[in-house]
Amino acid sequence: MYQSLAMAANHGPPPGAYEAGGPGAFMHSAGAASSPVYVPTPRVPSSVLGLSYLQGGGSGAASGATSGGSSGAGPSGAGPGTQQGSPGWSQAGAEGAAYTPPPVSPRFSFPGTTGSLAAAAAAAAAREAAAYSSSGGAAGAGLAGREQYGRPGFAGSYSSPYPAYMADVGASWAAAAAASAGPFDSPVLHSLPGRANPARHPNLDMFDDFSEGRECVNCGAMSTPLWRRDGTGHYLCNACGLYHKMNGINRPLIKPQRRLSASRRVGLSCANCQTTTTTLWRRNAEGEPVCNACGLYMKLHGVPRPLAMRKEGIQTRKRKPKNLNKSKTPAGPPGESLPPSSGASSNSSNATSSSSSSEEMRPIKTEPGLSSHYGHSSSMSQTFSTVSGHGSSIHPVLSALKLSPQGYPSPVTQTSQASSKQDSWNSLVLADSHGDIITA
């Protein structure tokens, strides 16, 4: 069981054992002050601490084995004249073990005082802490094996000779800050967080919004979203600054006159008719304002509009609904006959009324011998109304016609035949009447 301890101890000390600032560097036994050969203190490597039999209930035996191994490992590396059997650990008992620092070699200039040794231990502990944080768990195990001064060991409590160093870090820092409070009372440091006038970049003018009494040198504005400066350093409002930056000149203070609408142009009068009310103002060839009526008249006719056409009121266009013509059906005069598709009774009644009205409008001359031929005048008028389909278009023609018993002039006959192309029986009726003459 102890062969592994001896083999691990013979492999050499752990890394950092030969450091000049380490707490165990060049430590010797009590009688090694005059020896020219220096043997480092044998320490248990970190690989041994990970063994399971060194923890738990057998910690006391492991402590004895460790101390025995330490004392027995000394002669293996010692030269002639080295005192053997002087352990680096003076263990009085299993529970009351305390570390006694060995004497320092006279060849080195380290004074054997507790303060210098504490400083060296502090430097070594700092290096070990850095190595532990960077190397992970393996370095942590090595650090646990090398920290013999401030941690309880296997089964015994080791009293540390450096209680001040191992105290609370926060308390030590607070005490150090309180002891050295003089440098922190510098007015330079105290003025950093609470300066009354914070420095700003000269190009950033956004902080100037909160300043009081600032006025634009161009337009006199007291408030603006962003204060700007001109080339001479004077303050300009955002509008004046942008105008000066884009155009290179100062922003004009007089606003341009806003163009009034046609209904708000007060003071204008037509150069032709002198009216002051119009829906649209126009200009003539000379550039003078004229009303809409005079302008359109001059544009269409090329001459000025006569003053007699002037009206006090404005004539507007009477617009009709677009669907008005679609809803209405074509209407004729009261004497108009219905289409032939209607009933026979309605057709005959309409034909009678149309014939009576047509007879009243036009004079008809007949001879006594030919009266029998015109006994059915209603049928003849019905023929004309049926052919035309619209009484309004045929009535003026019938009103200008006259029937006379002097022969058959050809123009009237051709006109009647042309109007009755679709009805062949109409020509037969006209052929039977030998005595009527239609003259224009």
Curated annotation (Swiss-Prot):
Q: Where is it predominantly found? A: nucleus
Protein keywords = Activator, DNA-binding, Metal-binding, Methylation, Nucleus, Repeat, Transcription, Transcription regulation, Zinc, Zinc-finger
Residue ranges with Low complexity bias: 338-358, 371-388
- Feature: compositional bias, Basic residues: 316-325
- Residues in GATA-type zinc fingers run 216-240, 270-294
User: From start to end residue, where is composition biased (Polar residues)?
Assistant: 411-427
| Tissue spec | Expressed predominantly in gastric mucosa and at much lower levels in the intestine. Also expressed in testis.
- PTM N6-methyllysine: list the residues: 299
How is the polypeptide modified once translated? Methylation at Lys-299 attenuates transcriptional activity.
- Which intervals carry biased composition (Gly residues)? 60-82
Give the multimer and partner information: Interacts with the homeobox domain of NKX2-5 through its C-terminal zinc finger. Also interacts with JARID2 which represses its ability to activate transcription of ANF. Interacts (via the second Zn finger) with NFATC4. Interacts with LMCD1. Forms a complex made of CDK9, CCNT1/cyclin-T1, EP300 and GATA4 that stimulates hypertrophy in cardiomyocytes. Interacts with NR5A1, ZFPM2 and TBX5. Interacts with ZNF260. Interacts with TBX18. Interacts with PHF7; the interaction promotes GATA4 binding to its transcription targets.
Main function:
Transcriptional activator that binds to the consensus sequence 5'-AGATAG-3' and plays a key role in cardiac development. In cooperation with TBX5, it binds to cardiac super-enhancers and promotes cardiomyocyte gene expression, while it down-regulates endocardial and endothelial gene expression. Acts as a transcriptional activator of ANF in cooperation with NKX2-5. Promotes cardiac myocyte enlargement. Required during testicular development. Involved in bone morphogenetic protein (BMP)-mediated induction of cardiac-specific gene expression.
Kindly provide the name given to this protein in its UniProt entry: Transcription factor GATA-4
Natural source organism:
Rattus norvegicus (Rat)
Q: Which gene encodes it?
A: Gata4
